[in-house]
């Protein structure tokens, strides 16, 4: 397993960095030694310009000349993406938000490296925003992972308790999560999205259902009818877990 760790906090020994380090210790305890780490605060990352050049041949990444293309190959190669960031003003700090906005080129990865083959871990700490700030951030990554067909795990810490180094239970949680990847295997993509023009493939109906829900909001009016038809079909199968059927029910009242 190849792991990419992106630490977004400007504090190298802060809560999210400490939790990320503990997670990696757990990962390495089961042989996950192939870890590439970047501290985003030390990189030069310009905001995305929305030019979509990255989505056009030759699909070589981002045209902006900064440090993004240093991280890009490691992101492509990684099986596990770990994002560690504090909550500032009800969402993730700008260092991570800037990077996430630059993730458009990741949509051009070949089938062996595409987003549905990866797993996402989000590690965060928050203080004054409790509970709403962390909820907004977690929901963002639930939506991203759901749409992209990625697995997701979240570790959150309320820093009003003090530094996490003094919280053995939370450190143990991060360590145990790292160890939990001992049996992780890259997903085999077997189910293709039925929506015209999408082209995404997923490991199973579970991931496809979440993709359809996350991509079928009111901002996607032109696609909604086609998506709803596909989701209705999926909602009638017993192959979905209760949690996914609950998510579907937010869009389709009769799908739960």
Which functions belong to the PLM regions below?
Residues 1-84, 90-105, 168, 172-188, ...:
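N-terminal beta1-alpha1-beta2 submodule of the flavodoxin-like/Rossmannoid cofactor-binding fold
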Residues 236-253:
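Intrinsically disordered, low-complexity linkers and flanking regions associated
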Residues 190-192, 204-234:
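C-terminal recognition-helix end and immediately following basic linker
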Residues 94-95, 109-154:
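Short, glycine-/small-residue-rich phosphate/pyrophosphate-handling segment
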